[in-house]
Regions:
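Short glycine/proline-enriched turns and hinge-like loops at secondary-structure junctions
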Residues: 17-21, 114-116, 165
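Generic structural signal for well-ordered beta-strand positions
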Residues: 16-18, 62, 68, 161, ...
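AMP-binding/adenylate-forming catalytic core of the ANL superfamily
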Residues: 29, 34-35, 56-145
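Conserved AMP-binding/adenylate-forming
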Residues: 1-59, 63-64, 74-76
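Structural motif
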Residues: 51, 97-100, 156
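Conserved C-terminal "lid"/linker of ANL adenylate-forming enzymes
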Residues: 77, 106, 118-120, 135-183
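Short, flexible hinge/linker loops that cap or flank conserved catalytic cores
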Residues: 18-19, 46, 111-113, 146
Length: 183
């Protein structure tokens, strides 16, 4: 992108990553914001001292400078040191179980691995959990990306926003409530 400098940063260490390595996308340039009006705290969280804006997108940059957005940082979990994408797991569950917009993936704390995937599914969703998990394993997903059988939770309905998208804040709040019940 002409006039825009980008870099990919490891979300844990803050180190700049190399070509095709997945991390947080930072950018700066004349058309990139320099801060939040009258909110220095928010500005310091979003803008680095050298002027790069944290997009909160997980991305890679190839040797030609092409940026590939993988997802939003808020839609990833860190499980046993690996970044695990909620949205990709959600799509795979929806595809394999024929459950369009009837599932939502979030995470809750896990003492051993950092976080644990949880799957909420709408009461109207009809599927065989054991069969779905087998299909997920057979589809080539890494084991860390496959939720445990005891981490599927039925809800009346998946919370939705007025625009028809999943209400991810409510989904994450539901996962937080689960963790409060467990820990």
């Amino acid at each position: 992108m002409p006039g825009i400098a980008v870099k990919i940063i490891d979300p844990d260490t803050g180190a700049e990553l190399g070509e095709n390595e997945q991390g947080l996308l930072y950018c700066k340039g004349a058309s990139v914001m320099i801060g939040y009006l009258d909110d220095p705290e928010a500005t310091s969280k979003a803008i680095t001292p050298d002027g790069y804006y944290n997009t909160n997108d997980i991305a890679t940059v190839d040797r030609n400078g092409c940026i590939r957005i993988v997802g939003r940082m808020t839609r990833f979990s860190k499980i046993a040191g690996e970044m695990v994408p909620h949205e990709m797991i959600e799509r795979r569950i929806e595809e394999l179980g024929h459950l369009d917009n009837l599932v939502a993936v979030a995470a809750r704390p896990d003492e051993r691995k950092g976080e644990q995937l949880v799957v909420f599914y709408a009461r109207e969703a009809k599927f065989d959990k054991a069969e779905l998990l087998k299909k997920m394993r057979d589809s080539g997903l890494p084991n860390l990306w496959i939720p445990r059988a005891d981490c599927f939770f039925e809800v009346e309905a998946i919370p939705m926003l007025g625009n028809g998208k999943k209400d991810l804040k409510k989904v994450q709040a539901m996962a937080k409530e689960l963790s409060e019940d467990v820990f």
